[in-house]
Amino acid sequence: MATGVWVVESSLHDLDGAVTFEQRRFPKLIELHEELGSLLPKETMTIAGPYWGMNLVLWARGLVKFAAIGLGNAYQYHIPGGPPPPPANKRVALTALRRWAVASPDLKQWIQKNLNERISKTDPAHAQFLEVERLIERAMNSDDLGRRQIARFYKEWFDKIASAPHSGRALALYQDLSSAYVLGKTLTDLPKNEPGSRKPDRVARQLMLNCL
């Protein structure tokens, strides 16, 4: 008998911000894990992902024991032997927004504009964005720098939620994403070369609405 179950929706790239995510795809994924949880023995090892945020949502809600994450340029599962993934853009994590974006001169200008016009210097997000802005040019010219910055942020994000008691992790993740959503609502749209949603708040909002 199997002692573990690993479930991943390979077509789901939860950073895309598609309008179907929050009302249909994310709830359906949650329902699937709820049903599995009702059928599997309690001691079964359960794993979800890799995704960007839905793995954390499922884990924080107690629907899986482990959240699988991506390594490299994609937080998404690619089926072995399937079509090769498209060439990856070089990205950086926008830590205050709980998402990533393509590292480009346009992103650097976008950050500078919002730092000057939208984000107070007393806001902790100001220092976070300033750090990213200083990284972008080097990330554009490196195959590794952006990946390391994203991985470092992701570990810090995971550790923050993991520090909450088991029963409070879903609420902790909700509150964390809520702060990112509120900030994102005040910012201008991301550059036109961003392949996912250009709305700074959308990724956090869609994940937040499925935390509880």
Regions found by a protein language model. Give the residues of each.
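Intrinsically disordered, low-complexity regions
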Residues: 33, 58-61, 94, 133, ...
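Eukaryote-skewed repeat-based solenoidal scaffolds used as protein-protein interaction platforms
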Residues: 1-73, 78
